[in-house]
């Protein structure tokens, strides 16, 4: 005798349903649930449970699913219905009529990849949560180091006092009435109050929208900064304040990528923001490879070859991206390299996008901006050919990096030079749709580009804090570099700038084969093993792009101290010994 019990859009047909009791072990329950949740058909056995009815396609496309060797038996051997908790876990009692499914959402979003916050980052946060709950006694480490992302203050970089004091008044202007108390008790200097009053006069309140392009006074401060840096004038009308440089990249890419055939030249290895954004916009990433053997320098012939190859495929290449100093490579471009890229952009009518968010993170040589490079070329055009007059350049900067490290405040800017006024109007419209960048972030941009100067009350502390952060970063970068030099199968370029090292790693054949069996790329497998053994999260080179046949990983050197460097070296030796 059989009975049928409706459950939503499906029904369970149970053989000889009775009541009371069940002799399944926890292991059997787990196996049963796993079979259903994985949507795998099984071989029918006697006295089994059979799923039938119109809801069957939710589990599998076959007419029915048969669960092997799992009868529900009571004391008398009769078959019993499923317990309620299994029914509730596997099926909803309401019809499954969701409008959005993984198959009908924007597939360009689904295809986009952002390795910096991928599987490894998720797993590291699970470990961190476990340790915070006091449940990590089974782990071989007692702390998690997030060396996967340039997030300075997460790794204990202290905020610059002047910046935060100004921000505190911006958030609560009533503090201006307590100037004497703040000065005496918390060390607020006179110039802190002066700056806060100036900014409040411009933005009125950080809780109010600003102009879409950003507060006028702050854009003027940015223009003044660019002029001091480069020796050439800058127009605040050409400057847009943004929610970090990433927001500026998103705006520019949305304007540039007009059709699915649009292409953008991107350096490889690159920050995955670019490939992910192009993927979402259904446009083409046109990779050009940096020269690792020459300190990750830009090879202009390589860029030209990549451009021509893409054009032969029918790709309409409209822009070239340069990251200077590099991410993940840390390389800083020389002035001549910048001139070469600008010359190519002018010849091929490409928009040049200069990602310069690490411009203060330069350890070797000095930073050369693309804006200065363009103005130098225009001034040295002795034949007055006008070759560079129509070149479009967008330069980006951010409060997230450098010695500022205010990632969470989401502030940045981009300057646009040489753009058609009608295009600029469309960019203005695009940013207006998002209303404006966070106003507190705009204020942080202002103090970044206009910090305390010699002779001002806050300057001594500002200078002390700034130099300490810079020197600490440089010291840790060199400690990590020296450790990599001693590690078997690892080679690394000396740290030139930014917040990262991007070493090459050569793994034993047995390790490569084991990675393949695990369904992982070799560098990803190495990084996962490192995380499991040490709690240190780094990013596989594949997430940034790398030449075929090479393996890399990216690590920041933001974490304080050098103890964690020892964790890496010990793990690496054990890993290499394991797979000899």
What are the roles of these predicted feature ranges?
Residues 1-98:
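N-terminal mitochondrial targeting presequence
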Residues 2-5, 71-213, 217-580:
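PLP-dependent class I/II
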């Amino acid at each position: 005798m059989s009975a049928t019990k409706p459950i939503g859009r499906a029904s369970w047909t149970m053989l000889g349903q009775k009541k009371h009791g069940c002799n399944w072990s926890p292991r059997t329950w787990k196996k049963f649930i796993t079979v259903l949740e994985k949507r795998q058909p099984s071989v029918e056995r006697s006295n089994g449970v059979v799923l039938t009815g119109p809801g069957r396609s939710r589990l599998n496309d076959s007419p029915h699913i048969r669960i092997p060797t799992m009868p529900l038996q009571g004391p008398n051997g009769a078959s019993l219905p499923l317990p309620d908790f299994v029914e509730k876990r596997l099926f909803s009692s309401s019809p499954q009529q969701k409008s959005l499914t993984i198959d009908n959402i924007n597939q360009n979003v689904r295809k986009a990849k952002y390795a910096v916050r991928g599987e490894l980052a998720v797993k590291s946060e699970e470990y961190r949560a476990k340790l915070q709950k006091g449940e990590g006694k089974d782990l071989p480490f007692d702390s998690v180091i997030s060396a996967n992302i340039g997030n300075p203050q997460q790794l204990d970089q202290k905020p610059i006092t002047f910046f935060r004091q100004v921000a505190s008044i911006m958030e609560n202007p009533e503090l201006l009435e307590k100037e004497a108390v703040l000065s005496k008790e918390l060390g607020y200097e006179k110039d802190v109050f002066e700056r806060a009053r100036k900014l409040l006069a411009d933005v009125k309140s950080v809780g109010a929208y600003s102009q879409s392009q950003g507060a006028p006074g702050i854009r003027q401060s940015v223009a003044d900064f660019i002029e001091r840096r480069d020796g050439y004038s800058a127009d605040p009308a050409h400057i847009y304040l943004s929610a970090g440089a990433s927001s500026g990249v998103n705006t520019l890419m949305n304007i540039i990528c007009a059709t699915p055939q649009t292409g953008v030249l991107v350096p490889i290895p690159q920050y995955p923001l670019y490939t992910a954004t192009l993927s979402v916009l259904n446009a083409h990433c046109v990779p050009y490879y940096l020269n690792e053997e020459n300190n990750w320098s830009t090879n202009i012939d390589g860029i030209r070859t990549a451009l021509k190859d893409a054009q032969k495929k029918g790709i309409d290449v409209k822009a070239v991206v340069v990251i200077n100093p590099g991410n993940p490579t840390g390389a800083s471009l020389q002035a001549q390299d910048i001139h070469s890229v600008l010359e190519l952009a002018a010849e091929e009518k490409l928009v040049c996008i200069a990602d310069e968010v690490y411009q203060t993170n330069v350890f070797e040589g000095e930073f050369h901006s693309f804006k200065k490079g363009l103005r130098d070329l225009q001034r040295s055009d002795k034949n007055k050919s006008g070759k560079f007059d129509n070149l479009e350049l967008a330069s980006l900067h951010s409060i997230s990096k450098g010695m500022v490290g205010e990632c969470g405040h989401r502030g940045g800017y981009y300057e646009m030079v040489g753009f058609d006024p009608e295009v600029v109007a469309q960019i203005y419209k695009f940013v207006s749709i998002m209303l404006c960048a966070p106003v507190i972030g705009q204020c942080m941009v202002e103090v970044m580009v206009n910090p305390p100067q010699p002779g001002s009350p806050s300057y001594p502390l500002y200078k002390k804090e700034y130099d300490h952060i810079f020197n600490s970063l440089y010291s840790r970068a060199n400690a990590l570099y020296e450790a990599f030099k001693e590690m078997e199968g690892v080679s690394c370029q000396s740290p030139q700038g930014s917040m990262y090292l991007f070493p090459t790693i050569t793994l034993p054949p047995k390790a490569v084969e084991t990675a393949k069996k695990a369904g992982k790329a070799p560098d990803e497998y190495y990084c996962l093993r490192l995380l499991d053994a040490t709690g240190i999260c780094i990013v596989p080179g594949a997430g940034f792009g790398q030449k075929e046949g090479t393996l890399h990983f990216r690590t920041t050197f933001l974490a304080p101290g050098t103890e964690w460097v020892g964790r890496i070296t010990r793990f690496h030796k054990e890993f290499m010994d394991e797979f000899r």
